[in-house]
From Swiss-Prot:
Organism of origin: Xenopus laevis (African clawed frog)
DNA-binding region as annotated in the record: 134-193
Residue segments, region Disordered: 186-240
Compositional bias segments (type: Low complexity): 218-233
Motif (Antp-type hexapeptide): 109-114
GO BP field: regulation of transcription by RNA polymerase II
Entry-linked InterPro entries: HD (IPR001356), HD_metazoa (IPR020479), Homeobox_CS (IPR017970), Homeodomain-like_sf (IPR009057), HXA1/B1/D1 (IPR046327)
Cellular component per GO, a single term: nucleus
CDD domains hit by this protein: homeodomain
Protein name from the UniProt record: Homeobox protein Hox-A1
């Protein structure tokens, strides 16, 4: 019991509890609760002061920037709005102005609006073929050619093919040009007679000359062929 009490009192109470356990724990708590708290609180205080100074500097600079750049910015925005409003007003005046509606100005003619026409070509010998071919331009006759054609029309209202070839060679024309001119001249003659400007001639009242002209053209153009009556008679004589 003595040994146990002495061991417990000497070792446990004096050495362990008061010497090792009690004092170092309080010292550690004091150190941990005193110095770090004071340092941390000091840091907080200094940071708060710095933050307040920085915030006041920012507010002052922002206040300075607002006063220095605010009126100019507002002025530029106002000028932009005024320019846009004046532009819209000018466009409306141009589109809905009464002067442009009542008295339009001279319109400009562009190249794509112009109509292109081919100039008339002068007829030459051998340039145009027979009648019925496409893209046949109107022939511009000379004064000499018209005079000779009028002379021939005065004597002969209808031409044979041989006479037409002769006149075309003499006037440097082709047969089709001479034929068309005579057809148009006969139509013009009939129109004047119907209107009462010219007396009715016996040659133009009948179409026998025109039919004879067509028959002469067909006989000259087609080759000679035996008649069907002669061919049948020859066939019967050969068989008999």
């Amino acid at each position: 019991a003595y040994a146990h009490s002495s061991c417990g009192s000497n070792y446990g109470m004096q050495n362990f509890s008061p010497g090792y356990s009690h004092f170092p724990i309080h010292q550690e708590t004091e150190v941990s609760s005193g110095f770090p708290q004071s340092v941390y609180s000091g840091n907080i205080a200094s940071s708060v002061v710095q933050h307040q100074q920085h915030q006041s500097y920012i507010e002052g600079s922002a206040h300075y920037i607002h006063h220095s750049y605010g009126p100019e910015q507002n002025l530029s925005v106002a000028n932009y709005n005024n320019n846009v409003a004046s532009l819209h007003i000018s466009q409306r005046e141009v589109c809905h102005s009464p002067s442009s509606e009542t008295s339009p100005g001279p319109t400009q003619t562009f190249d794509w609006m112009k109509v292109k026409r081919n100039p008339p070509k002068t007829g030459k010998a051998g340039e145009y073929g027979y009648a019925g071919q496409p893209n046949t331009a109107r022939t511009n006759f000379t004064t000499k050619q018209l005079t000779e054609l009028e002379k021939e029309f005065h004597f002969n209202k209808y031409l044979t093919r041989a006479r037409r070839v002769e006149i075309a060679a003499a006037l440097q024309l082709n047969e089709t040009q001479v034929k068309i001119w005579f057809q148009n001249r006969r139509m013009k003659q009939k129109k004047r007679e119907k209107e009462g400007l010219l007396p009715i001639s016996p040659s133009t009242s009948t179409g026998s000359d025109e039919k004879s002209e067509e028959l002469s053209e067909k006989s000259n153009s087609s080759p000679c062929a035996p008649s069907p009556a002669s061919s049948t008679s020859d066939h019967l004589s050969a068989s008999g």
